[in-house]
């Protein structure tokens, strides 16, 4: 799926429409704990989070994530959208819960980005 498909599956609003949303999404990670995001994600991972502060964009930038989906209908300040655009990190917004958002993406074939004992299937393909 690309980010346009993700937006469609999640009934999401695209908050950074000037960015390229044709990039492919292979795996996703849902978290509000940014230390977990840094520890367990791989480049190009799609992050689903309820966080709406600038640290979520800075973390996505450091981890080279493929985009951010703000869940639970949390209000996103314009400054967060501007920072995401400046960092070239696609930002989407949905009223769905984290649980339902992750479930819809999983049903659509997006893989989880978690470590499985003895398996390297959690690694997102290089894009």
Describe every region a protein language model picked out.
Residues 22-23, 27, 31-46, 50-123:
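Feature captures the catalytic cores and cofactor-binding loops of soluble hydro-lyases/lyases
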Residues 11-18:
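Short secondary-structure junctions
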Residues 125-127:
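Feature 3881 marks metal-assisted phosphotransfer/nuclease machinery
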Residues 1-4, 97:
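Short, structural beta-strand-to-alpha-helix junction motif
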